[in-house]
Amino acid sequence: MRVDYDVAAALRHEGLKPHDYDEICRRLQRAPNRVELGMFGVMWSEHCCYRNSRPLLSSFPTSGHRILVGPGENAGVVDLGDGQSLAFKIESHNHPSALEPFQGAATGVGGILRDIFTMGARPIALLNALRFGPLEDERNVGLMEGVVEGIAHYGNCVGVPTVGGEVAFDSSYSGNPLVNAMALGLMETDEIVCSGAHGVGYPVIYVGSTTGRDGMGGASFASAELTKASLDDRPAVQVGDPFLEKGLIEACLEAFKSGDVVAAQDMGAAGLTCSCSEMAAKGGLGIELDLDRVPARELGMTPYEFLLSESQERMLFVVKPGQEQSLMERFIRWGLQAAIVGCVLEEKVVRVLQKGEVVAEVPANALADDTPIDRHELVSDPPLEIQAKWDWQENLLPVVGLKGINLNSQSHFGSNISWDEILLKLLDDPTIASKRWVYRQYDHQVQANTVSAPGVSDAAVVRLRPQQGKGSVDEVKRGVAAVVDCPNRWVFLDPERGAMAAVAEAARNLSCVGAEPLAVTDNLNFPSPETPTGYWQLALACRGLSKACKTFSTPVTGGNVSLYNETRLADGKIQPIHPTPVVGMVGLVHNLVNVCGQAWLEPGDLIWLLGVPIDTTVAVDPRVSLAGSSYLECIHGLVTGRPPEIDLKLECLVQSFLRNSITEGFVRSAHDLSDGGLAVAVAECCIAANLGAHIELPSSDARLDRLLFAEGGSRILVSVPSTQAVAWQKVLNQAKTTAPGSVFDQYLGVVTADDELLITQAGNRLVQLPLNQLRECFEQAIPRRMGLDLSSSV
């Protein structure tokens, strides 16, 4: 069959390869027309079909006693007990946010919310994981301002609280920021709305906004590297309307309660093409779509434009015959467009009509189920660059003493730097510093169910208040905790260990608020898998995620893969991001009374370290290290070394012990040791509480910078009332008896009423800093780099 288009040019435009075209022709038994080729282009993109990553994802654990819905639907669903279920998922909007940060981030929020309420759940919380280049570059400042404003605008207007997240900075993200949005939704019914069409002849209803030319080919755009020419792809960035989405949420939840909706699918990536093909393929049926009935925003739209538009706030329903009119009236009352645009077919095809003519007809499974897989060879050894970094040893660092470090003359800090100065430098690192400038723009109290606000605890906590208005706030005892985590520097240096650490830290943060970890949603942000290094990073990270999720019994319920996150520089070189597998994890809080924050509560409380103890010998415990640490990068300008070993057994022991201790009322505050190690964690607790601390390090021949700033080791800082000292020691001894050979506690010091942080060793002062200096450094790091007024940042 001859075609009326330039095949080579069309393939380039759609991001398809010649062998893809040959396969399409084989499946259709003919050459595709230009509309059909566009449909294949978006549906066979990495963004939609995971053609490079699908074999790796199959290793993830996906089942468990609480899992109601796993991968394959719009969102995962877990059983919370007491007649409540939680829908949750994370998605990326990286490439759109790089070009139009406000709309890219805003529509990312809108899209993840639709995934949640399409399942029949009411959205109750949002989180986000963001990555930017250094704020010394004005372009990165502009990107960050736009992204944060977009997230705030959409979340605040739609009435869903943004309760947590993480923000990190690295030069690898300068041309390609990451914007990952996570949402949670509460369900109180057994009726989970799925997306598979059923009922031959059942009507298909279009609901929501009109269809325009915005977002054209967004799925293909999201599956390619960014270049200067990408600026021409601004039409691929969608435009959102949070007020319309608010009406869509209410109208859809009402419609679902009626029982008249048999299947639902939001129109996200690939728009009508994706929603029709996925609903048809999952149901084992077909769908006929009449474009003349689709509410259009612009005149003269072609079939290609209708099918590939990613206009926001749109849904597709399959409904029971005879109920379509009452449902459409309901939607119209909410100010939404509603139209019958097609029907369910027995024939397993997506058939598209315009002006009575068939403009496209493709087997549904060819678009949404039986899609191609690109297989890559996994190299057996790490890349040479990484092998060289693994050879690094701590003894290569400058000599340390009680007063600090003797640096070489080429250091930008001069020849010497004290421990006080080092701690302040770390607190001034934007990745470690307070994110108050970010989260104060988010409404985290809307819906009045937020228990732990951003910056207060290691994980967000939201009250599980009944949606039907039964019971007062005070009567609600249970909550759900959520967190997003990824140590991207560790993943860059060792993808398997780094990914394991991401899961471990997410679970540890949930445990720090007293929550039982339940399940995971993941967002795999990686560069191109078509290079040996890129695929090695992706494959080993998936291996690490799988191993850790199995150990923690936290199944993966779904997520997102975002590849080709890299920038082609002016000189033609490729700048890949650090591989960033973001782990979103949810947990159940059985009693909100016991929720812990980071802040000390009372002077005199005892400070204990759980996890691998501080070294008392020169021998280096491989579970705690300066390799890959914030200290190494911030102070010495090095991103090197092999990150610490991840002791998953110890993680489980420590976290279980912590949760039990919180439940029993022993632990008053809890904060995990992460970026910056012990000294930074103690400083953060002091800043949060406005109380001081005196930490006495044990006598040791180990390097002092290792004692103060090393990372890893499943470590958590807790405070215990002094009145409970004897009982607490009994609990610790009992835990050691239960798990012989695992020493995982160490007394460090005491909370003080003094306005300073004091760290000593054998009576020698190492760190002595007033709280106001710590706080000023911590709170002003980001606003100062952005050139903002500092008077309101503390």
Curated annotation (Swiss-Prot):
Pathway annotation from the record: Purine metabolism; IMP biosynthesis via de novo pathway; 5-amino-1-(5-phospho-D-ribosyl)imidazole from N(2)-formyl-N(1)-(5-phospho-D-ribosyl)glycinamide: step 1/2
Sites where the protein binds substrate: S92, H93, N94, H95, R114, Q238, E310, S311, Q312, S562
Pfam entry (one): AIRS_C
InterPro entries for the chain: PRibForGlyAmidine_synth_PurL, PurL_linker, PurM-like_C_dom, PurM-like_C_sf, PurM-like_N, PurM-like_N_sf
Active site: H47, H93
EC number annotated for this UniProt entry: 6.3.5.3
Major location (coarse): cytoplasm
UniProt GO BP: 'de novo' IMP biosynthetic process
Catalytic reactions of this protein: N(2)-formyl-N(1)-(5-phospho-beta-D-ribosyl)glycinamide + L-glutamine + ATP + H2O = 2-formamido-N(1)-(5-O-phospho-beta-D-ribosyl)acetamidine + L-glutamate + ADP + phosphate + H(+)
Keywords noted in UniProt: ATP-binding, Cytoplasm, Ligase, Magnesium, Metal-binding, Nucleotide-binding, Purine biosynthesis
GO-annotated molecular function: ATP binding; magnesium ion binding; phosphoribosylformylglycinamidine synthase activity
Binding annotation for Mg(2+) 2: D115, D266
Top EC class of this enzyme: ligase
Residues binding ATP, per UniProt: Y50, K89, D522, G559
Origin superkingdom: Bacteria
Amino-acid positions noted as binding Mg(2+) 1 in the UniProt annotation, renumbered to this chain: E91, N560
Family statement: Belongs to the FGAMS family.
NCBIfam families tied to this protein: FGAM_synth_II, PRK01213.1
Reported function: Part of the phosphoribosylformylglycinamidine synthase complex involved in the purines biosynthetic pathway. Catalyzes the ATP-dependent conversion of formylglycinamide ribonucleotide (FGAR) and glutamine to yield formylglycinamidine ribonucleotide (FGAM) and glutamate. The FGAM synthase complex is composed of three subunits. PurQ produces an ammonia molecule by converting glutamine to glutamate. PurL transfers the ammonia molecule to FGAR to form FGAM in an ATP-dependent manner.
Assembly behavior: Monomer. Part of the FGAM synthase complex composed of 1 PurL, 1 PurQ and 2 PurS subunits.
Protein name per its UniProtKB record: Phosphoribosylformylglycinamidine synthase subunit PurL
Species of origin: Prochlorococcus marinus (strain MIT 9313)
